């Protein structure tokens, strides 16, 4: 939920009227990528128990694909229908709704492909020109991570430090090797490739597997990381605006900054859970809709951005609108979850019946 809210907050600040007024579009874009990196780490943290319970690799993949693809497709269809109606007479927003590709462009394959979480670089490579509609660029990456998770989990169990170092080296290699592809416009962005983002997912797996050992040295780790980050802050202030890739979460160099920050965030949440379990338990009650929130938030923010003059709002008005948008996202996500859950459970029951 924290990662979802931070992404919503960053995308809200990147809307027209904020980016020009406060010149924060680039900074917020980088913070949003950092939040999605946190989302990858959380996904890795939660995947280890599923891998441990795995009895069959085939069944594991089926279950994970259903858990990811069914909510994605339901959100795609419901939001596409709603947005198509909302933007029926708005030419500026038609290109953001996939259904218009079928209604006016006859690009039926684009619409069908958009119903499944596919890496946008694959879509770009195939030249399908589909809209960034549901879940943005990272849902296809999550699916790829799930497919790699049994292998990554074994690596994390047997050699955590070596496997993390190898994943970072692989990230650097792929990122640099695809430089020419990005210049030739063959891929969307190098940093959104699955192989480039593996370290964050693997780091989450390692945090779960070795959480008890890390708990024993938590104090020393926190002090060491804070000293390290303080040194980076001094460098950041002295060289502002930063020219290097170290402070850009889209570049593999940023792993040396984002991974320690992710550990601090995980530790902070653990401390909050120990400090006030009841409050955190209430907050975690929203976690069931966090996936739907990540899928629908960009479309809802688009709708408000298109309808409201953000630049003309007062400071109070902008804060109030953020609260309204967040509330709408929560309500819509709950409704989407209610639509998706029966379909998802039906597919899972069919799968279990087939297995037995």
What are these regions (language model features)?
Residues 143-170, 206-225:
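Solvent-exposed interhelical
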Residues 68-141, 172-180, 257, 261-265:
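Membrane-interface helix-loop-helix regions
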Residues 1-47, 66-88, 140-144, 148, ...:
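Kinked, hydrophobic transmembrane alpha-helices enriched for aromatic residues
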Residues 194-203, 209-285, 289-292, 299, ...:
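Alpha-helical transmembrane segments and terminal signal-anchor/GPI-anchor hydrophobic tails
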Residues 338-356:
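Membrane-proximal cytoplasmic C-terminal regulatory module of class A 7TM GPCRs
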């Amino acid at each position: 939920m924290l990662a979802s809210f931070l992404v919503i907050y960053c995308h809200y600040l990147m809307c027209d009227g904020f980016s020009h007024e406060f010149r924060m579009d680039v900074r917020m874009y980088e913070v949003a990528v950092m939040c999605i990196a946190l989302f990858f780490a959380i996904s890795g943290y939660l995947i280890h128990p599923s891998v441990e319970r795995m009895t069959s690799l085939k069944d594991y993949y089926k279950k994970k694909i259903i858990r990811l693809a069914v909510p994605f497709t339901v959100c795609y269809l419901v939001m596409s229908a709603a947005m198509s109606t909302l933007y029926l007479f708005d030419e500026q927003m038609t290109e953001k709704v996939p259904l218009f590709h079928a209604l006016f462009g006859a690009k039926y394959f684009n619409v069908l492909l958009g119903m499944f979480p596919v890496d946008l670089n694959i879509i770009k490579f195939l030249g399908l020109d589909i809209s960034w509609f549901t879940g943005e660029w990272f849902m296809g990456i999550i699916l790829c991570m799930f497919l790699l998770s049994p292998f990554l989990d074994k690596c994390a169990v047997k050699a955590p430090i070596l496997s993390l170092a190898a994943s970072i080296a692989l990230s650097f290699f792929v990122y640099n090797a695809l430089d020419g592809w990005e210049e030739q416009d063959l891929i969307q962005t190098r940093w959104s490739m699955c192989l480039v983002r593996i370290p964050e997912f693997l780091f989450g797996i390692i945090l779960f597997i070795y959480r008890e050992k890390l708990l024993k040295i938590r104090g020393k780790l926190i002090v060491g990381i804070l000293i390290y980050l303080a040194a980076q802050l001094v460098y950041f202030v002295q060289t502002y605006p930063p020219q290097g890739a170290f402070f850009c979460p889209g570049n593999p160099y940023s792993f040396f900054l984002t991974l320690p920050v992710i550990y601090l965030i995980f530790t902070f949440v653990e401390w909050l859970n120990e400090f006030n379990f009841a409050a955190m338990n209430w907050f975690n009650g929203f976690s069931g809709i966090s996936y739907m929130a990540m899928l629908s938030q960009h479309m809802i923010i688009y709708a408000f951005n298109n309808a409201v003059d953000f630049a003309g709002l007062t400071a109070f008005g902008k804060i109030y609108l953020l609260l309204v948008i967040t509330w709408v996202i929560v309500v819509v996500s709950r409704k989407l979850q209610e639509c998706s859950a029966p379909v998802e459970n039906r597919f899972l029951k069919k799968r279990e019946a087939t297995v037995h």
